[in-house]
Amino acid sequence: QGPWMEEEEAAYGWMDF
């Protein structure tokens, strides 16, 4: 988990989903 919870769409960009 990280600071990407706020922006689900944009955050997943740098995540390994």
UniProtKB/Swiss-Prot annotation:
Gene Ontology biological process terms in this record: response to food
Keywords tagged on the record: Amidation, Hormone, Pyrrolidone carboxylic acid, Secreted, Sulfation
Parts of the chain that traverse the membrane: none
Domain of life: Eukaryota
Location of Sulfotyrosine modifications: 12
Coiled-coil segments: none
PROSITE patterns reported for this sequence: GASTRIN
Subcellular location: Secreted
Modified residues (Phenylalanine amide): 17
Modified sites of kind Pyrrolidone carboxylic acid: 1
Molecular-function GO terms, alphabetical: hormone activity
Function: Gastrin stimulates the stomach mucosa to produce and secrete hydrochloric acid and the pancreas to secrete its digestive enzymes. It also stimulates smooth muscle contraction and increases blood circulation and water secretion in the stomach and intestine.
Family: Belongs to the gastrin/cholecystokinin family.
Record-given protein name: Gastrin
Organism: Macaca mulatta
Taxonomic lineage from the root: Eukaryota, Metazoa, Chordata, Craniata, Vertebrata
